Amino acid sequence: MATPWRCALLMILASQVVILVKCLEDDDVPEEWLLLHVVQGQIGAGNYSYLRLNHEGKIILRMQSLRGDADLYVSDSTPHPSFDEYELQSVTCGQDVVSIPAHFQRPVGIGIYGHPSHHESDFEMRVYYDRTVDQYPFGEAAYAADQTGTSQKQAYTPEEAAQEEESVLWTILISILKLVLEILF
């Protein structure tokens, strides 16, 4: 009788180990992201640590709280962003991700806040440069530093977008009409 319980317990333990290993692995990042920096630090409860970002372009900040809970605040208008004054934030219990647009004025202020629920928080922040192409509503495309044209996306014009919407509507309408005809006949 103890054997089935032992097997069940081993299965539960094995699944917990697999989940733990997956959590500890680095998350996959897109190929378009180029790792620029890795910053590790420790912050006390209720305190801020400030960093300054000078890199141009679209930047991704991925911060993992290794112990405790560190939160992320970003601003292009103040060098010392806080929970009262910021443009972008991520305040999760775990991994915090903020995407800083290319149009933000440099230098960008980064504030890391140690949540009061923990005496101290350890964090690791990875700074990535996003090399993907941004699409603009007026048909302009801003391309990354790679100007070879190998991975450039073409911007849609308003006429193409209208034609695509019209095509989708016609497809839906014809499908509904076929369904009605099939039911009737």
Swiss-Prot record:
Annotated glycan sites: 47
Any matching Pfam family: UPF0669
GO CC terms, sorted: extracellular region
BP-aspect Gene Ontology terms: apoptotic process
Family affiliation: Belongs to the UPF0669 family.
Name of the molecule in the record: UPF0669 protein C6orf120 homolog
Keywords: Apoptosis, Glycoprotein, Secreted, Signal
Compartment list: Secreted
PANTHER family reported in the protein's UniProt record: UPF0669 PROTEIN C6ORF120 (PTHR31703:SF2)
Chief location category: secreted
Organism, as annotated: Rattus norvegicus
Domain of life from the UniProt record: Eukaryota
Function field: May be involved in induction of apoptosis in CD4(+) T-cells, but not CD8(+) T-cells or hepatocytes.
Organism ancestry: Eukaryota, Metazoa, Chordata, Craniata, Vertebrata
Signal peptide residues on this chain, from the entry's feature table: 1-23
